[in-house]
């Protein structure tokens, strides 16, 4: 059994209208045994009980995300380079170059959203030339919101987009004056071209998919999420892409 208490009163928010805040909680086998004052909770103290002092931090009930691409995000989490919070485009391009150097073939470098040009000091997106200079040989896929993606020359080669490739029904391949793909994919009229292109990248072996999904879930836990509804989509397949969840559940991870 675990007992959690706080040196300051009323730091547990319960979302219970009749008992909205509490000083301490007792948990046994993953379920709340008591929610109330320190005195009430400490009545459950016995040999082997783990006591956790939150030291003034606030605890809230776990959050549920009703629309999350848990499977897709988990399968690719360890493959992604994340630009959220990066202060400058120069820093982002440096990170891209470093990631490309340590990415083994045939894997790609993937920046799957989570950033905007307005976070950068330069207040602009990277150019295709800058991306090609940072990663001349390793395929790179950079998703910008849901409106476009940037691919370097190496990525265009492995996905097979050429002058003769027609635009798919769900998107547009931007081309230069000679009709050759530039590396920009435009989500017009929808984002299908972005999903379809990202799905062409190589997958991790099952063991590494399990590790990647576990890491993704721990990150969600860090942000306060304890449950989610998987929204599917994005070219993941049932049941094979859901094997990781079954394995993590079996291992209680």
Residue map of PLM features:
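Divalent metal-binding segments
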Residues: 2-8, 13, 17-62, 66-253
């Amino acid at each position: 059994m675990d007992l959690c208490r706080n040196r300051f009163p009323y730091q547990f928010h319960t979302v219970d209208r009749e008992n909205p805040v509490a000083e301490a909680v007792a948990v046994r086998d993953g379920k709340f045994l008591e929610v109330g004052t320190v005195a009430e909770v400490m009545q459950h103290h016995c040999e082997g009980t783990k006591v956790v002092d939150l030291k003034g931090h606030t605890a809230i009930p776990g959050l549920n995300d009703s629309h999350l691409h848990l499977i897709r995000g988990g399968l690719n989490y360890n493959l992604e380079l994340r630009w959220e919070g990066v202060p400058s485009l120069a820093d982002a391009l440096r990170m891209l170059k470093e990631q490309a150097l340590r990415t083994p073939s045939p894997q790609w470098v993937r920046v799957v959203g989570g950033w905007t040009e307005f976070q950068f000091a330069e207040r602009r997106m990277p150019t295709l030339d800058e991306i090609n200079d940072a990663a001349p040989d390793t395929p790179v896929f950079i998703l910008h919101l849901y409106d476009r993606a940037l691919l370097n020359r190496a990525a265009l080669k492995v996905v097979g987009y050429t002058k003769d490739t027609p635009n798919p029904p769900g998107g547009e391949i931007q081309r230069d004056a000679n009709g050759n793909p530039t590396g920009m994919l435009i989500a017009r009229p929808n984002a299908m071209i972005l999903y379809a292109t990202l799905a062409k990248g190589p997958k991790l072996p099952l063991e590494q998919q399990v590790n990647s999904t576990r890491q993704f879930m721990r990150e969600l836990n860090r942000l306060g999420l304890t449950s989610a509804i998987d929204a599917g989509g994005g070219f993941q397949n049932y049941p094979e892409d859901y094997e990781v969840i079954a394995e993590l559940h079996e291992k209680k991870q």
